[in-house]
Structures are given as structure tokens and as C-alpha cells.
UniProtKB/Swiss-Prot annotation:
GO cellular component: host cell cytoplasm; host cell plasma membrane; membrane; virion component
Free-text note regarding domains: The BC-like-box motif mediates the interaction with elongin BC complex. The HCCH motif (H-x(5)-C-x(18)-C-x(5)-H) mediates the interaction with CUL5.
Region (Disordered) location: 161-201
Inducing factors: Expressed late during infection in a Rev-dependent manner.
Lipid bilayer topology: Peripheral membrane protein
Keyword Membrane among UniProt keywords: yes
Residues annotated with Phosphothreonine modification: T98
Chain span(s) of sequence motif BC-box-like motif: 147-156
Biological role: Counteracts the innate antiviral activity of APOBEC3G. Forms a complex with host APOBEC3G thus preventing the entry of this lethally hypermutating enzyme into progeny virions. Functions as an adapter molecule, recruiting APOBEC3G to the ubiquitin-proteasome machinery. Targets APOBEC3G for degradation through the assembly with elongin BC complex, CUL5 and RBX1. Binds viral RNA and affects the stability of viral nucleoprotein core. May play a role in viral morphology.
HCCH motif (motif): residue ranges: 110-141
Phosphoserine carried by residues: S147
Residue numbers spanned by region Multimerization: 154-167
Biological source species: Human immunodeficiency virus type 2 subtype B (isolate D205)
Protein's recorded name: Virion infectivity factor
Length: 216
């Protein structure tokens, strides 16, 4: 008698490539800049019995909740080993959990990680003073209805001018984003934990979908 096969179905997001860049970025922000110091990085050899899981990244959030980004590999073992990768985004709170989309995951993360405009920036902008803080996670605000204050600060931050196209500030922040990911690729966990080098500037985070290359 043939043994009955049980299936466990969970929503996942396909990844067009490998997850090394994602792992390197997490380690860079955890050990080099310290911005993700509280985040737990669990590599595949510490996951345990879940052999299809290549990593777990656990982001502690407010009020005892947390967000887990779980990476999967070799999702079609019946066809032999294939370089197929995907991630699962799950939000946990006590005895409850639910899967979330990348945009919701960005909003949850930005509530605890990566700096945003401070409460005093609106007054500084009205007085014509220099803005001292910026939003380093702009993709987390997409899909929301922004306040007029936030829109005004975004205009000041990006220095928008309809006749000049993309501002120098926005270009610089995009370069900073690429630089962060490029540095993350060179991240060496063993060397960085005791390197003694000064912390890098606050990181501009482009969002989970862009970093992971999620194919919706």
C-alpha cells in the first residue's frame, strides 16, 4: 500500500537569484553599523529539522511582536536539486501569526528600524532651517495616505524642482543605497565583529522587495 503524502501549503514570494546578498546585508547592518543589532540571524545549519529552510531573519518589533523573513531553497526535490529560492514573510504576536505582503512587512519594520523624520522637522522646515533628520526607509510609506507634513518634508528632503528632473539629494541617496548593498556583499562576519572600525552612516534601506528581488 502506497504511503499517503501530506502537503503543507504556505504563501511564499519567489526570488530570482540566491539569498547571499540578503544575508550579507543583514550581517553588515547587524555587526558593522549596529542598526540591526537586535535582529537574530539564523543560518541554515542552525535551523534544525527544516532542511528546506536556508535562513531565518527575526526582527523584534514593538509590544512583543516580531517579523520573520524565512528563506527557502530546493522547493522541488521531486525534480532533483534546483536553484529555486523563495521567502516567507510572517508576523507574530503572542499565540497569533499571519503571513504579510512585502509592503506591509516594510511598514512593520519601519516602525522599529531605520530612522524617519523627527517631530521637530516640520517647525524647522516652516522656519526655513536645515532639516536634521531624514526618512531612510521611504518605501515603507508607499501604499499609505501620507500627511501634508510628511509630503512637505519629502519635498524638502528630495529638493524637488519640476524643471530640473531628479534632485541631487535623491540621486545621492540612491547611490548610498547601492553603496550599502555593495558593502554588504563584501561583509565578512568574523572580521567585522572585532574590527574596531567606526560605524558607517545611517543606512538608506530601499525596501524588502528591492533588496530581495521579489517576483510577485
Amino acid at each position: 500500500m502506497e504511503e499517503e503524502k501530506d502537503w503543507i501549503v504556505v504563501p511564499t514570494w519567489r526570488i530570482p537569484g540566491r539569498l547571499e546578498r540578503w544575508h550579507s546585508l543583514i550581517k553588515y547592518l547587524k555587526y558593522r553599523t549596529g542598526e540591526l543589532q537586535q535582529v537574530s540571524y539564523v543560518p541554515h545549519h542552525k535551523v534544525g529539522w527544516a532542511w528546506w529552510t536556508c535562513s531565518r531573519i527575526i526582527f523584534p518589533l514593538n509590544k512583543g511582536a516580531w517579523l520573520e523573513v524565512q528563506g527557502y531553497w530546493n522547493l522541488t526535490p521531486e525534480r532533483g536539486f534546483l536553484s529555486s529560492y523563495a521567502v516567507r514573510l510572517t508576523w507574530y504576536e503572542r499565540n497569533f501569526y499571519t503571513d504579510v505582503t512585502p509592503d506591509v512587512a516594510d511598514q512593520l519594520l519601519h516602525g522599529s528600524y531605520f530612522s524617519c523624520f523627527s517631530a521637530n522637522e516640520v517647525r524647522r522646515a516652516i522656519r526655513g532651517e536645515k532639516i536634521l533628520s531624514y526618512c531612510n526607509y521611504p518605501s515603507a510609506h508607499e501604499g499609505q495616505v501620507p500627511s501634508l507634513q510628511f509630503l512637505a518634508l519629502r519635498v524638502v528632503q528630495e529638493g524637488k524642482n519640476g524643471s530640473q528632473g531628479e534632485s541631487a539629494t535623491r540621486k545621492q541617496r540612491r547611490r548610498n543605497s547601492r553603496r550599502s548593498i555593495r558593502l554588504a556583499r563584501k561583509n565578512n562576519n568574523r572580521a567585522q565583529q572585532g574590527s574596531g572600525q567606526p560605524f558607517a552612516p545611517r543606512t538608506y534601506f530601499p525596501g524588502l522587495a528591492e533588496v530581495l528581488g521579489i517576483l510577485a
